[in-house]
Amino acid sequence: LEDFIAKTNIDGFFLDTMSSLPDSFITIQKKFPSFEFASEGTPKEQRQIEQLTSSWDQIGDIRRNYKVEIEANMFRFVFPEHPLNMVSRWSVGSDKDSIIKRAAFNGMGLVIWQDVFGVWLPFNNKQKQQIKKLKNVFNKYHNIIFGSNSVPLIETLSNGLICNQFYNDNNQKIFAIYNFTNKSIKGPLVALEPIVKTKIQQIFGIKTNLQIKKIKKINT
């Protein structure tokens, strides 16, 4: 394998059906420190998490297996240095919308798998545009989204909202906010520290009128 890697200059291996790195591959990792080992299963033990460079967050039928469209992925926030890429191979239609929303809410990549063992299950044009926008956001704001100070499910100030906070060492933050209700919410979202110079912009999702206001001695 070492000879094959040296001759082909490949970037890494995908460990199909696996969630750990075989002991025989450890020497490869030592000889090629930047080599990628991505597993299909999310690792569960410390050794696996340390040795694998990334893994899939693979879910089945969203409608059947999950009661909510969006939820926080705690593994992603506990181990931000271990990229998780979301995939639901058999999802179709609006279920693919849910996968994109989950990836955006948790700051996670997507596995684009459309030809599933000969079954063609494509993303539609609108979904492809959303994925492209999300990729651009991840590239532009990578150091914030994968910041070590990120926190899942911070307190929100209106009922029906959940929020993940991505936060880097330069005090830059991204709030991923999801509305659980089927109605528009007009009101405070999250509390901000009383910083003199604060700039805010929306970078993804449904266009929203965002403002910074002081409400009851809390900058919101």
Where are these regions (language model features)?
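C-terminal beta-strand-rich structural cap/linker in extracellular carbohydrate-active enzymes
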Residues: 213-220
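A short, surface-exposed interaction/processing loop segment used at functional sites
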Residues: 202-212
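Active-site-proximal substrate-binding groove within the catalytic cores of carbohydrate-active enzymes
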Residues: 22-198, 204
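Active-site groove signature of glycoside hydrolases
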Residues: 1-22
